[in-house]
């Protein structure tokens, strides 16, 4: 179900709690909300739809990837960029990495590891920051 985007900075500044299998419904809510905002959005974290759980979604090409309890394992190739966010107005400078490796659980609660480069890596890092309460 599509959800309203949270813009409350105090709420977004809180560290998200680990997800469990009871939170699998968030995959559909995040997917529906991402699709509804596809003109201006390429990724979301669960706190952006009002749920303080460690769940993110982002587009990897045409395929939305949902990650439960993602953990950044490694990063390489730092660079400076500017990003926007549905929860904020405007763009802000930030540091990102060209290549990252992330472990997570998928929608079937299976452990996965993925290496991302370029724009998908940037999106994933942005959403991982949301889980830590870091706002660009």
Question: What are the functions of these language-model segments?
Answer:
Residues 1-136:
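Positively charged
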């Amino acid at each position: 179900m599509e959800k309203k985007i949270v813009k409350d900075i105090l709420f977004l500044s809180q560290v998200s709690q680990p997800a469990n299998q009871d939170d699998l419904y968030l995959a559909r809510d995040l997917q529906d909300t991402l699709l509804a905002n596809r003109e201006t959005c390429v990724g979301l974290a669960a706190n952006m739809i009002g749920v303080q759980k460690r769940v993110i979604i982002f587009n990897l090409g045409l395929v939305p990837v949902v990650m439960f309890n993602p953990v950044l394992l490694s990063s390489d190739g730092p660079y400076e960029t500017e990003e926007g966010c549905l929860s904020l107005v405007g763009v802000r400078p930030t540091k990102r990495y060209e290549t990252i490796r992330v472990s997570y659980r998928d929608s079937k609660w299976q452990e996965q590891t993925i290496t991302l480069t370029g724009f998908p890596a940037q999106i994933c890092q942005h959403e991982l920051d949301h889980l830590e309460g870091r706002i660009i």
